[in-house]
Amino acid sequence: MFCLISAIAGIGRYGLLTWVPTYFTEALGLSIKDGIFSSILLPVGQACAMFVFPLITDKVFKGKREPMLILASVITFLGMVCFPFIKSQLPASIMLFVLGVFAMVTGVIWAIAGDLGGRAFSSTIVGGLDWAVCMGAAMQAVVFGFVKDTFGWPAIFATIGCLYIILLVLTFVARKMKTKRI
């Protein structure tokens, strides 16, 4: 279950990292030089998530990982729905930072590896989850070019948004499986 969640996270993370700079040049008409600051805000937000998400899950949600995945899924979906309608650089830049933070759910997923594998097997679990992230990254590279050429820019963001809704559903399923096991 968490491998599917990880794969979706890889599609979202690398889909945004790959296609946002191209979106700025093609859809917003910015040169690479003009759009570079905006494009950098996405990975800066993702880096922040790696520290913020585990902290929030531990301090606010008392070690429960699922509420953070749920919050991240909903905010990422809403951001993906809104992003294609933003037509100027400053709001797009702010949105990219926010999306970078919330789309980067692997900060929570790596913590789940410790929950699932314990001290003995957490590295093995991380390896499996990281493999799934990489497979998601590879899938987006193959599929999103076709999606963009066939359906246009909004379809890429809508696809990522819909995938985060699937991530949300998978999180609820994983939560139910976890409570049944206990």
PLM region descriptions:
Residues M1-F51, Q140:
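Extracytoplasmic gate region of multi-pass secondary transporters
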Residues I5-Y14, L42, Q46, F83, ...:
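Hydrophobic transmembrane alpha-helices of secondary-active solute transporters
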Residues T22, V108-L116:
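Intracellular helix-loop hinge segments at the cytoplasmic ends of transmembrane helices
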Residues F24-T25, I56-T57, F144-G152:
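Interfacial helix-cap and linker-helix signal at transmembrane-aqueous boundaries
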Residues M50-G63, K148:
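Helix-to-loop junctions at the C-terminal end of transmembrane segments
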Residues G63-I109:
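C-terminal transmembrane helical hairpin of 12-TM major facilitator-type secondary transporters
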Residues F83-P84, W153, I160-I182:
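Multi-pass alpha-helical transporter architecture, strongest
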Residues G114-F151:
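A late C-terminal transmembrane helix in Major Facilitator Superfamily
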